[in-house]
Amino acid sequence: TGIHLSGTPVGVGISLGKAIILHPGTPEEPPRESSNPPEEELQDFHSALEHTINDTIKLVEKISGDVGPEEAAIFHVHLMFLEDQHFQEKIQNYILEGNSVSWSIYETIEEYLSAFSEIDDPYLSEKGADLKDVGYRLLHFLGHELLAETQKEGILVIEELLPGDM
Protein backbone atom coordinates (compact mmCIF):
# COMPACT_ATOMS: atom_id res chain seq x y z
CA THR A 1 0.00 0.00 0.00
CA GLY A 2 1.80 3.04 -1.21
CA ILE A 3 1.49 5.98 -3.48
CA HIS A 4 2.06 5.54 -7.18
CA LEU A 5 3.95 8.43 -8.75
CA SER A 6 4.62 8.79 -12.43
CA GLY A 7 6.74 11.25 -14.32
CA THR A 8 9.59 11.57 -16.70
CA PRO A 9 12.54 9.45 -15.59
CA VAL A 10 16.03 10.85 -15.72
CA GLY A 11 17.66 7.47 -15.20
CA VAL A 12 17.15 4.14 -16.90
CA GLY A 13 15.03 1.27 -15.60
CA ILE A 14 12.46 0.85 -12.86
CA SER A 15 13.07 1.98 -9.31
CA LEU A 16 11.40 1.12 -6.06
CA GLY A 17 12.20 2.96 -2.90
CA LYS A 18 11.51 5.84 -0.62
CA ALA A 19 10.58 9.07 -2.39
CA ILE A 20 12.77 12.04 -1.57
CA ILE A 21 10.62 15.05 -2.43
CA LEU A 22 12.58 18.19 -3.15
CA HIS A 23 10.82 21.46 -3.62
CA PRO A 24 12.52 23.42 -6.34
CA GLY A 25 13.95 26.63 -5.11
CA THR A 26 12.30 29.01 -7.48
CA PRO A 27 13.81 32.17 -6.18
CA GLU A 28 11.76 34.98 -4.84
CA GLU A 29 12.45 38.31 -6.42
CA PRO A 30 15.70 39.56 -4.86
CA PRO A 31 15.86 43.03 -3.33
CA ARG A 32 16.09 45.63 -6.06
CA GLU A 33 18.23 48.17 -4.25
CA SER A 34 21.88 47.62 -3.59
CA SER A 35 23.98 49.03 -0.78
CA ASN A 36 27.07 48.57 -2.96
CA PRO A 37 28.24 50.93 -5.69
CA PRO A 38 27.42 49.80 -9.25
CA GLU A 39 31.11 49.07 -9.90
CA GLU A 40 31.10 46.39 -7.17
CA GLU A 41 27.83 44.95 -8.43
CA LEU A 42 29.28 44.79 -11.97
CA GLN A 43 32.34 43.03 -10.62
CA ASP A 44 30.09 40.49 -8.84
CA PHE A 45 28.15 39.96 -12.08
CA HIS A 46 31.29 39.38 -14.13
CA SER A 47 32.59 36.96 -11.50
CA ALA A 48 29.31 35.00 -11.43
CA LEU A 49 29.21 35.02 -15.24
CA GLU A 50 32.77 33.68 -15.47
CA HIS A 51 32.07 30.97 -12.88
CA THR A 52 28.84 29.96 -14.62
CA ILE A 53 30.52 29.79 -18.04
CA ASN A 54 33.39 27.71 -16.65
CA ASP A 55 30.96 25.44 -14.79
CA THR A 56 28.91 25.00 -17.97
CA ILE A 57 32.00 24.07 -19.98
CA LYS A 58 32.85 21.44 -17.35
CA LEU A 59 29.28 20.11 -17.56
CA VAL A 60 29.58 19.82 -21.35
CA GLU A 61 32.80 17.83 -20.96
CA LYS A 62 31.37 15.61 -18.21
CA ILE A 63 28.06 14.88 -19.96
CA SER A 64 29.84 14.32 -23.30
CA GLY A 65 32.15 11.78 -21.67
CA ASP A 66 29.54 10.08 -19.48
CA VAL A 67 26.53 10.03 -21.80
CA GLY A 68 27.47 11.44 -25.18
CA PRO A 69 27.84 14.70 -27.08
CA GLU A 70 24.20 14.78 -28.20
CA GLU A 71 23.01 14.91 -24.59
CA ALA A 72 25.55 17.64 -23.82
CA ALA A 73 24.21 19.84 -26.61
CA ILE A 74 21.70 21.48 -24.26
CA PHE A 75 24.58 23.07 -22.38
CA HIS A 76 25.85 24.65 -25.59
CA VAL A 77 22.54 26.54 -25.62
CA HIS A 78 23.30 27.63 -22.04
CA LEU A 79 26.68 28.94 -23.19
CA MET A 80 25.00 30.84 -26.02
CA PHE A 81 22.75 32.62 -23.50
CA LEU A 82 25.65 33.35 -21.15
CA GLU A 83 27.84 34.72 -23.93
CA ASP A 84 25.05 36.70 -25.61
CA GLN A 85 26.01 40.39 -25.74
CA HIS A 86 22.41 41.66 -25.47
CA PHE A 87 21.71 39.45 -22.44
CA GLN A 88 24.86 40.69 -20.68
CA GLU A 89 24.22 44.34 -21.58
CA LYS A 90 20.66 44.21 -20.28
CA ILE A 91 21.86 42.96 -16.89
CA GLN A 92 24.72 45.48 -16.82
CA ASN A 93 22.37 48.37 -17.67
CA TYR A 94 20.10 47.47 -14.75
CA ILE A 95 23.15 47.39 -12.48
CA LEU A 96 24.37 50.78 -13.74
CA GLU A 97 20.93 52.20 -12.88
CA GLY A 98 21.71 51.34 -9.24
CA ASN A 99 19.96 47.98 -8.98
CA SER A 100 21.43 44.95 -7.24
CA VAL A 101 23.17 42.35 -9.38
CA SER A 102 20.77 39.62 -8.16
CA TRP A 103 17.69 41.66 -9.02
CA SER A 104 19.19 42.64 -12.39
CA ILE A 105 19.74 38.99 -13.33
CA TYR A 106 16.33 37.97 -11.99
CA GLU A 107 14.51 40.77 -13.83
CA THR A 108 16.32 40.10 -17.12
CA ILE A 109 15.45 36.39 -16.92
CA GLU A 110 11.81 37.20 -16.11
CA GLU A 111 11.60 39.57 -19.09
CA TYR A 112 13.04 36.97 -21.46
CA LEU A 113 10.74 34.26 -20.06
CA SER A 114 7.74 36.53 -20.52
CA ALA A 115 8.71 37.15 -24.15
CA PHE A 116 9.24 33.41 -24.77
CA SER A 117 5.87 32.54 -23.22
CA GLU A 118 4.05 34.77 -25.70
CA ILE A 119 5.42 32.79 -28.65
CA ASP A 120 3.48 29.63 -29.51
CA ASP A 121 6.47 27.46 -30.32
CA PRO A 122 7.43 24.33 -28.34
CA TYR A 123 11.11 24.78 -29.25
CA LEU A 124 11.18 28.27 -27.75
CA SER A 125 9.34 27.01 -24.67
CA GLU A 126 12.23 24.59 -24.12
CA LYS A 127 14.67 27.46 -24.54
CA GLY A 128 12.78 29.26 -21.78
CA ALA A 129 13.58 26.38 -19.41
CA ASP A 130 17.23 26.59 -20.47
CA LEU A 131 17.27 30.33 -19.81
CA LYS A 132 15.67 29.81 -16.40
CA ASP A 133 18.40 27.30 -15.58
CA VAL A 134 21.09 29.77 -16.66
CA GLY A 135 19.58 32.47 -14.47
CA TYR A 136 19.30 30.18 -11.45
CA ARG A 137 22.90 29.09 -11.87
CA LEU A 138 24.09 32.71 -12.09
CA LEU A 139 22.18 33.46 -8.89
CA HIS A 140 23.67 30.37 -7.27
CA PHE A 141 27.17 31.72 -7.86
CA LEU A 142 26.06 34.92 -6.14
CA GLY A 143 25.17 32.90 -3.05
CA HIS A 144 21.48 32.15 -3.59
CA GLU A 145 20.54 28.57 -2.71
CA LEU A 146 17.88 27.47 -5.15
CA LEU A 147 17.64 23.71 -4.83
CA ALA A 148 17.90 21.91 -1.55
CA GLU A 149 20.78 19.45 -1.42
CA THR A 150 20.17 16.13 0.23
CA GLN A 151 22.36 13.25 1.29
CA LYS A 152 19.36 10.94 1.72
CA GLU A 153 19.11 7.80 -0.39
CA GLY A 154 15.97 7.22 -2.38
CA ILE A 155 14.15 8.28 -5.51
CA LEU A 156 14.31 11.99 -6.22
CA VAL A 157 10.91 13.53 -6.88
CA ILE A 158 10.87 17.10 -8.10
CA GLU A 159 8.40 19.14 -10.13
CA GLU A 160 11.02 20.41 -12.56
CA LEU A 161 14.62 19.25 -12.85
CA LEU A 162 16.68 21.61 -14.96
CA PRO A 163 19.77 20.35 -16.78
CA GLY A 164 22.11 22.33 -14.55
CA ASP A 165 20.70 20.52 -11.49
CA MET A 166 22.21 17.24 -12.66
Regions found by a protein language model. Give the residues of each.
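Non-catalytic, soluble scaffold/interaction modules
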Residues: T1-M166
